[in-house]
């Protein structure tokens, strides 16, 4: 009986120790939760400017467009804007020519849903390509 009481007291002491340890950990967690990770507005604006300037540099490198290609693009844009205003309207194409894109689309839909002519259709599809 005396042994049981001493073991019981040890268990109570162990429970109290673990409770106090958990409480210390909770206080540390609560202190971290209350901390604000926000920096000053000036610092965040500088970081934002830095990230935008880095993105601009990555999007358009210095040697992406040569001078000749830039002139070509400007000339093409100008011709697409000016020529429709200057040239007379063209007559409509023949009716049969208008059916060509529709025929191509119908052919592609038929080919997409057509079953394959593979003799052994029970095998795994991926093993045929590997």
Curated annotation (Swiss-Prot):
The keyword Endoplasmic reticulum applies. Residues 65-116 are annotated as: Organ Size Related (OSR) domain. GO terms for biological process: cellular response to ethylene stimulus; positive regulation of organ growth; regulation of cell population proliferation; regulation of developmental growth; response to auxin. Keywords: Cytoplasm, Developmental protein, Endoplasmic reticulum, Membrane, Nucleus, Transmembrane, Transmembrane helix. Disruption phenotype: Reduced aerial organs mainly due to changes in cell number and the duration of organ growth. When associated with ORS1 disruption, reduction in organ size. Its main location: membrane. The OSR domain is sufficient to promote organ growth. This is Protein AUXIN-REGULATED GENE INVOLVED IN ORGAN SIZE.
